[in-house]
Amino acid sequence: MSEFSESYHLRGIDIKEGVALLQRAGLKGYVFPPKEGWISIVAEGNSFAPDERITAQNTGTLLHYVSAEDHGWSFALFEGKELRCAYDCGWDDDVRVDDSRYSPEALSRALGAGGATAVAAAEEILHPTDIDAAIDTEPARVFAEAMRLPRFEWFAYDYVAHDFHESPSEYVGVIKVAP
């Protein structure tokens, strides 16, 4: 089975900021305690694109991250409601890259200290030459690690909604949000 992950990562140190974002958006979801300066969020309604209900309510720095292991990956970085950086790479038939909204400066700002170095390391995987290179280099993982995302593998609303009740000990500190 292929991994499909879709999540939001809000820059901050107070879990209440993530809860408030989902509440303003009127969506169900789960908010994870801050780690590495990111508050990880999964929200109902996965569409593999940033949900306008969330981005329209954003007041901070928010990263939308998608990894569809055998198909491609993408990210979009928002500062407030404004899209500041985006990238999409797919490889269903041929490798397709859309980096028309890519901005290393915006990613560096989001990371703060050491951001430029981390972004430079991740840039090596942004333009795969063929499908094998796109899969073998694990670009989504490399990017997520460079961005210091605390959670990104097998991380989506449906997975968390199922596991939250099945394995509560793995979700200590996680807040379930209902509109």
Residues covered by each model-derived region:
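A composition-biased, non-transmembrane "mature-region" signal
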Residues: L22, V42-A43
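A generic structural motif
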Residues: G29-E36, L63-E69
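Charged interaction segments
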Residues: A43-P179
